[in-house]
Each structure stands twice: as structure tokens, then as C-alpha cells.
Amino acid sequence: MYFMAEDYATLGHYDKASALLHSLNEAYRKGGQAVNPVFEAYEDVYSKLSKCGTFSVERPNNNVSVPLLTHTGNRKNPEMMFIMANINGQEVKCTYDSGAGINVMTTKFAERIKATVIQTKNIQMLGMSYADSKGLVVVDSLKLGDLVYRNLPFFVVDMRTDNPLANKKLEELGYECVIGTQTMMPLDEICFDFDRMQLVIPASYTPTPTYAPNFYHSPQRLYHLSLTDGRSGRKIDAIVDTGASGTILTNRYYKKNENCFTGRMATDSLRTAGVGSVNVVKTIPVSWTFTLAGEQYTETNIPVIRSSEQNEEYDCRIGLPTLMAHRKFIINFKNMWMRFED
């Protein structure tokens, strides 16, 4: 029922999504079981969104192309990738983030567009750490080139941390809005053309190729696909994250493969700043190979997370340097496949 509710929400049918989640939550209560707080929170969110106008996408009959920008101007070490959008008449640099299950704007930007913040049950969001939403904003319009979203929801978050260096970096990045997977799913297909540095939204989707791996959309609204791990020889679960500055093997991967790291010490620390705080983890640097759709890929130096408080539900996060090493990266939502093109 949760996935049916999410399907309704993706299409903008928030009343139906809320009703389904209400039925699910009531069934838990009547059965004497604890209600999943995520289900309960989204029942409240969708109920309130149903009163804010219908979500819709207006698109032309032609391809839409939007320039892609990186923070460094270097595809090998991009740090962050952005697109320029227009939200309620205000130009803003946004992260176009396949690793974000929701759309997010800073409290500062919400004030800038004079948005009305709707209070909802608390939603915890996983960036580099957990942070609580300050509420919900529904924007009248978000424009990407000739593409227009209407009545699009954003969660409002104070991204500042208690670390001055992290705050300085966030200010440098100009981190004001995150456009997440909710905006991608209704488009049928998107193409990251890294050679031309453009996000292309084609007028018609590509027929399914013979070698493209399938992926699924998780309850956390992330895009998961299966890889063959060159170290263990087993299938592992990866997410594709266009908002991630690097590729990592998670603490879950480490725990499942500790025997592969016998005698290896966590010699490095990885310090990351994200939504609301700073996180420091111990890492082991490794060279790593994986196979996807019959093609083998090698990462010469990526971190394995030796310790973490985040309890990731995946083994690997594929970030920007890995993705941008290819000419193109296509995500097809019509038939749920991904493909690199070289």
C-alpha cells in the first residue's frame, strides 16, 4: 500500500495517497502494532498537500536542454553539480540530486520568495546527517528551461551547522535548493550529457536496450541497482547519487565483507557536511572494481566506511566522479533502466 501511495503522490494525487496511508496506519493500530513514523508523517504531508492545488508538469513537444554546472569546473573532481532554475520568478542555483528523495529549500531561500510555510508532522531527512524539516512550502512554479512544474512541494531546512568551516563551504557552494527524485520520475527519461554539460529531457523516451540494467525506487525514494562486486564476487546493492561528491563503499558493505579487510587499518578520516551538521567517519582507502551490465569498471581510490552512525540500506553510493567519467548517463523511468554511454 505504501508503494501505491507513493505512485499516487508522484502523479500529484495527494488525496488518494493520504487515504491509502491512513488505511495502512489504521490497520497497524488495530493490529496492536507500532505505526511506521515515516508512513504516519507522509499521511499528514499528503493530506495537507491535497489542499494546495494539483501537482502537474507542463512540457513542450521538443527536447528540453538545461546547462549543467559544476562547482570546480572539473569533471574529474566536480564537488557538486547544479542547474539553474526559476522558482516563483526567482533565479536560483539548484542541486539536481538523484540521491534526494524529496525537494528541499533553505530557510533563507523560503524567506527570499516570501513563501508560506505549512507545518506538518516531523520528517527526518538523511543528508550527510539527519535533520528535521521546518515545514513544507508549495511553490507555484519551478521552471527548467521550457519545462514547468506547478504546485511543487519543498521541505524547508536550516542547513547551517555548528561548524564554521562547514558553514563557509556551504556558503561558497551557494547551496539553496535541492531538486530531488520526485521531479524526475514524471519525466519518463532524463539524460545527463556530460560531454556537452547539459541535462536533456527528451520529447520521447528511448526504447529499452538489451544491456541496460534495471533499477528500483526504494521507500526512501532512492534509485537502487545491482552490481557485481569485484572484491567478493557477490551482487551488491548500489544507489546512484548525482548529489554526491564521490563514490564510496558503505559501512554496511564493510560489515558484510570484513574478511576482505583483515589486517587493514582505517588510516583515513572522511569529514562531510550536509543537512544540519558535520559527520566524521573512519575509512579504508581501496582500489575497487565492479561489473555492471557486462562491463567492468575500476575505481583506483575510494573510501570504505569503517564506522558510521547512518545505517545505510545500500552497499555502495555511486557519485559524480564515477558518473561524469562517461559521455552520457541515461535514466529511463518508463521501463526503469539506466545506462552509461561512452
Predicted features by range, described:
Residues M1-D342:
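Pepsin/retropepsin-fold aspartyl endopeptidases
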